[in-house]
Design a protein with these regions (language model features):
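A short, structured beta-strand/loop element
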Residues: 31-47
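Local beta-strand/beta-hairpin segments that build beta-sheet-rich folds
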Residues: 4, 16, 44-53
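Short, mixed-charge low-complexity intrinsically disordered segments
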Residues: 68-86
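Short N-terminal "domain-start" leader segments
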Residues: 2-34, 65, 71-73
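A short, charged, amphipathic alpha-helix used as a generic interaction element across diverse proteins
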Residues: 49-71
Length: 86
């Protein structure tokens, strides 16, 4: 699946997603020097991602443009997962 990169979460159309969330990863395998926000529908990743240099950039953008709440990663989650915005 070809990723659709957005510069801001405000570019994402959540209207067609029943239970959307944003999973934030720190230095995942496919972007080892970046932070990545991946848009999900329930347990399925969509093709949309936001890539930034710092975690703070991602957090500020999501806080500014959504009403989502942050949930930190659990012990069973992949190590690169920072947490999920729902």
């Amino acid at each position: 699946m070809q990723a659709k990169r957005v510069e801001s979460i405000r570019e994402v159309d959540f209207s067609g997603l029943k239970v959307p969330f944003v999973a934030v990863y720190g230095h995942p395998d496919d972007f080892p020097d970046k932070y990545v926000a991946r848009i999900y529908e329930l347990d399925r990743a969509t093709d949309t991602i936001m890539v930034k240099e710092t975690l703070e950039e991602i957090e500020m953008d999501i806080k500014e443009h959504t009403a989502m709440t942050f949930i930190p990663r659990g012990t069973a989650d992949v190590p690169s997962l920072v947490g999920v915005w729902m």
